[in-house]
């Protein structure tokens, strides 16, 4: 804090070449630290060698106490500043791992989980595509199965129709055979009747008539009937063989188609069974992948919640540390401002001390060379310098001119 002193008008000379210098015995300071303490000097004629009046001694003592307290306060502030710096350094060293925690392991775990999730998603997509392909293949096989089933039904209906035709032909054959048998019986009956009639006529006529008639040659009915029978039998046999050959051919073709259809049906059924097994296995694997995905999502959610809570705690800790650091910085700025104020006060005090020292030295140069003959402003002799009045005064040393000293720019005072 600045000191306000009432300084009297002082006439300071820059050189003391016109006056003798004060002897070395008279340049000694009467108070400890008086060379560095500003003094309240009223007039150059108020003091003489080794003597001050009471007000000047009290002022010097007061200024000495003030300067000592000021220096003690400066030392105390420097010690406090050093302690605060050490405390800040220790706090920064202690809280450095808290301010910069290592999340590399958590980041690696999160990256691994993300990679697993991506792999699971890709595997899930691949399984979905495979399931869709299996469904499409199953639909194709189902369509083929329906087509083959309709073809089989058509072939079975054709076989049933051919069987009905075969039954009809068999019935026709049996009817024709029955007609042939009836015709044979009728022929036999006609033959027997004819023979009986011939015999009867022979018996009636006897030997009475011998009629020779040139008649046309008789027709052998048996031969005609046999020929007709053979023709019909040949025709029936031909028709039968043709029908049997056609039926055999159709039956063989149908059997081949049935065999091929049954083989294809068995292969299709085996493929359908295999596809059903594959679909069941894929559904089980898909369910397992869904469960794994759900568990991974739950784990990720728990990890995110845990890490978010830890991050909030760390952020709150960082906020507290930043607030403490801001408070410490504000305290440091305030103490720095106080320290700057004290430095300014110290500089002003040093300037005043230098000014007072220059004034004291200039007044010391104005003292006479013989201190015993010095008189005060009232023209009253001041006692001898020595304590023993009988001891003569020692002649002073020869005067050495004082060299001019540089002055301080801001306060226009002498530099030590």
Swiss-Prot record:
<feature type="region of interest" description="Linker 1">
    <location>
        <begin position="92"/>
        <end position="102"/>
    </location>
</feature>
<dbReference type="Pfam" id="PF00038">
    <property type="entry name" value="Filament"/>
</dbReference>
<feature type="domain" description="IF rod">
    <location>
        <begin position="56"/>
        <end position="367"/>
    </location>
</feature>
<dbReference type="InterPro" id="IPR002957">
    <property type="entry name" value="Keratin_I"/>
</dbReference>
<keyword id="KW-0403">Intermediate filament</keyword>
<feature type="region of interest" description="Head">
    <location>
        <begin position="1"/>
        <end position="56"/>
    </location>
</feature>
<feature type="region of interest" description="Tail">
    <location>
        <begin position="364"/>
        <end position="416"/>
    </location>
</feature>
<protein>
    <recommendedName>
        <fullName>Keratin, type I cuticular Ha1</fullName>
    </recommendedName>
</protein>
<keyword id="KW-0416">Keratin</keyword>
<feature type="region of interest" description="Linker 12">
    <location>
        <begin position="204"/>
        <end position="219"/>
    </location>
</feature>
<feature type="region of interest" description="Coil 1A">
    <location>
        <begin position="57"/>
        <end position="91"/>
    </location>
</feature>
<feature type="region of interest" description="Coil 2">
    <location>
        <begin position="220"/>
        <end position="363"/>
    </location>
</feature>
<dbReference type="GO" id="GO:0030855">
    <property type="term" value="P:epithelial cell differentiation"/>
</dbReference>
<dbReference type="GO" id="GO:0005856">
    <property type="term" value="C:cytoskeleton"/>
</dbReference>
<dbReference type="GO" id="GO:0045109">
    <property type="term" value="P:intermediate filament organization"/>
</dbReference>
<dbReference type="InterPro" id="IPR018039">
    <property type="entry name" value="IF_conserved"/>
</dbReference>
<dbReference type="GO" id="GO:0005882">
    <property type="term" value="C:intermediate filament"/>
</dbReference>
<feature type="site" description="Stutter">
    <location>
        <position position="305"/>
    </location>
</feature>
<dbReference type="InterPro" id="IPR039008">
    <property type="entry name" value="IF_rod_dom"/>
</dbReference>
<feature type="region of interest" description="Coil 1B">
    <location>
        <begin position="103"/>
        <end position="203"/>
    </location>
</feature>
<comment type="similarity">
    <text>Belongs to the intermediate filament family.</text>
</comment>
<dbReference type="GO" id="GO:0005198">
    <property type="term" value="F:structural molecule activity"/>
</dbReference>
<keyword id="KW-0175">Coiled coil</keyword>
């Amino acid at each position: 804090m600045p000191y306000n002193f009432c300084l009297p008008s002082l006439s300071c000379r820059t050189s003391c070449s016109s006056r003798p210098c004060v002897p070395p015995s008279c340049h000694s300071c009467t108070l400890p630290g008086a060379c560095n303490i500003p003094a309240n000097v009223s007039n150059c004629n108020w003091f003489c060698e080794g003597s001050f009046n009471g007000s000047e001694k009290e002022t010097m003592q007061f200024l000495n106490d003030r300067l000592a307290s000021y220096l003690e306060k400066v030392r105390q502030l420097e010690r406090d500043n050093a302690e605060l710096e050490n405390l800040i350094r220790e706090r920064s060293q202690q809280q450095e791992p808290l301010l910069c925690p290592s999340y590399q392991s958590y980041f690696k775990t999160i990256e691994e989980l993300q990679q697993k999730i991506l792999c699971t998603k890709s595997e899930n997509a691949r399984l979905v595509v495979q399931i869709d392909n299996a469904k499409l293949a199953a639909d194709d096989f189902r369509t083929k199965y329906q087509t083959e089933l309709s073809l089989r039904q058509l072939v079975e209906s054709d076989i049933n129709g051919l069987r009905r035709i075969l039954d009809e032909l068999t019935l026709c054959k049996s009817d024709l055979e029955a007609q042939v048998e009836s015709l044979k019986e009728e022929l036999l009956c006609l033959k027997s009747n004819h023979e009986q009639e011939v015999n009867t006529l022979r018996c009636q006529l006897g030997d009475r008539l011998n009629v020779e008639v040139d008649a046309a040659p008789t027709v052998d009915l048996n031969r005609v009937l046999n020929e007709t029978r053979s023709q019909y039998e040949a025709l029936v046999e031909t028709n039968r063989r043709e029908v049997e050959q056609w039926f055999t051919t159709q039956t063989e073709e149908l059997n081949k188609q049935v065999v091929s259809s049954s083989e294809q049906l068995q292969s299709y059924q085996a493929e359908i069974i295999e596809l059903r097994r594959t679909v069941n296995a894929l559904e089980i694997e898909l369910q397992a992948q869904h469960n794994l995905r759900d568990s991974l999502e739950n784990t990720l959610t728990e990890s995110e919640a845990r890490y978010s809570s830890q991050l909030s705690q760390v952020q709150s800790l960082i906020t507290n540390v930043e607030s403490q650091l801001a408070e410490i910085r504000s305290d440091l700025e305030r103490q720095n401002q106080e320290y700057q104020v004290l430095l300014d006060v110290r500089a002003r005090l040093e300037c005043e001390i230098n000014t007072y020292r220059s004034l004291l030295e200039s007044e010391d140069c104005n003292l006479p060379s013989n201190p015993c003959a010095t008189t005060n402003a009232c023209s009253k002799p001041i006692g001898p310098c020595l304590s023993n009045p009988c001891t003569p005064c020692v002649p002073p040393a020869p005067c050495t001119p004082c060299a001019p000293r540089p002055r301080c720019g801001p306060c226009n005072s002498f530099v030590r």
